[in-house]
């Protein structure tokens, strides 16, 4: 009942997402690794549609990795911004501060400290239950919906930008707050 009222008040897809997450907490699954390797071949093909692979440079390959990891980098940036990173990243405190100050992108941090991948150890115990409910089930859908028109025009995901990050960060924050409010984040 509370979830239904909340959805009516919020009136957004996010409200429905959180209702779905709250209703399916029992279906929470351990966070599986998400890594740019999963998307590299597709991004390579899309990039090759614009430039002959025979002419690819190291910079081109770096750009392809950025495209393949953008959704991961955006989420990791939100995790860092909100202090929800795992103990594994405490040694990277200088770079964490650079990300928070927007002097290092999430993609740069992901490449330097995570080998272009996320796993459960990248998250604090406090946020991991939310990530397990939200990341693969809803975040990816929200990311795709938000950036699909831009991606279609470019033939690939947009590269990391702080403007795009701000758009998706609002949605992640809203989903997290509603998730906590609905009692899933006890």
Q: Where in the sequence are the language-model features?
A:
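Amphipathic protein-protein interaction modules
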Residues: 99-167, 171
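N-terminal low-complexity, intrinsically disordered segments
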Residues: 15-104
